[in-house]
Amino acid sequence: MLDAPDTAVLAVNLGTPETPTAPAVRRYLAEFLSDPRVVSIPALLWQPLLRGLILPLRSSRSAAKYAQVWLPDGSPLMVYTRQLAQAMQALLPSLTVRHAMRYGEPALGSELDCLAAEGARRIVVLPLYPQYSTTTTASVEDRVDAWQRRNPGVTVSLVRDYSVDPGWVEAVAGSIRRYWEQQGRGQTLMFSFHGIPQRLADGGDPYPQRCEASARAIANALGLASDEWQLGYQSRFGRERWLQPYAEPSLWALAESGVKQIDVVCPGFATDCLETLEEVAMGFTETLAERGATMRYIPCLNAEPDHARALARLAVASLA
């Protein structure tokens, strides 16, 4: 696709604890929840609460959840991100393709340092967040901008959003089609996206519009009528109002209205992780079963060939 030996692509995912243990989860959450892009409460107020109450309470509980989805080679997010970067490398043999995490290891800044030390003079940073948000993509952008100021000899570009990129949309639609061909089609398809606080959207974060655009584009690619799919938001944290409709209560309402088989896909997540596997595939399925309905979870794209091809094309296009 491109002959550029001094060019690298760095695929950046959110991050994961190194092990499914309370100490590892505590280290990870401490970094993640200390990012002002994630929690905007002033540090003088937030840090005592975080370290004195939230981390002691959440670390063990979260570790138990991670243990339920952990793979032999590590956390699903890490395993699939690594495999995805390897698949992209196979498609871009004249470039260097690596992966990094915004929180945890391999750290974003360290991987940029390594690529520069190895001779990269152009680096494409590809956050694995299809829909731009100030809580995710912008946090990566902050780190990249700070690194760029310290390393003016390297040109860094960043893919900010690919929520309606045709290659990515078709990759998601194709994965859903294949699932339906093998397993049959449910009565309704739910697109479940990670939520953000409503106040961020009110303040101008375009994330909900990006999610809606993604859902519409995928539904159109599948030929779905407007009454054959829904959108919801999951993973609410804290007590404030987040984006609505909330996914799980929406699923309950479908079950209570007589819908007995519901398919759920999470196109805001590039790879499967705790939120898709434990919260959705396990948790949503269980609570829907209690209401007499069956939920089938359609996996994320992970390292599927169509996913790697779509992201490789995005990286190359950003170099034009």
Swiss-Prot record:
InterPro entries: Ferrochelatase, Ferrochelatase_AS, Ferrochelatase_C, Ferrochelatase_N. Pathway: Porphyrin-containing compound metabolism; protoheme biosynthesis; protoheme from protoporphyrin-IX: step 1/1. Belongs to the ferrochelatase family. It holds the Pfam family Ferrochelatase. It is found in: Cytoplasm. The keyword Acyltransferase does not apply. It comes from Stenotrophomonas maltophilia (strain R551-3). GO terms for molecular function: ferrochelatase activity; metal ion binding. This is Ferrochelatase. It catalyses: heme b + 2 H(+) = protoporphyrin IX + Fe(2+). GO terms for biological process: heme biosynthetic process. Its EC number is 4.98.1.1. Fe cation binds at residues 194, 275. One of its GO terms (cellular component) is cytoplasm. It comes from the Bacteria.
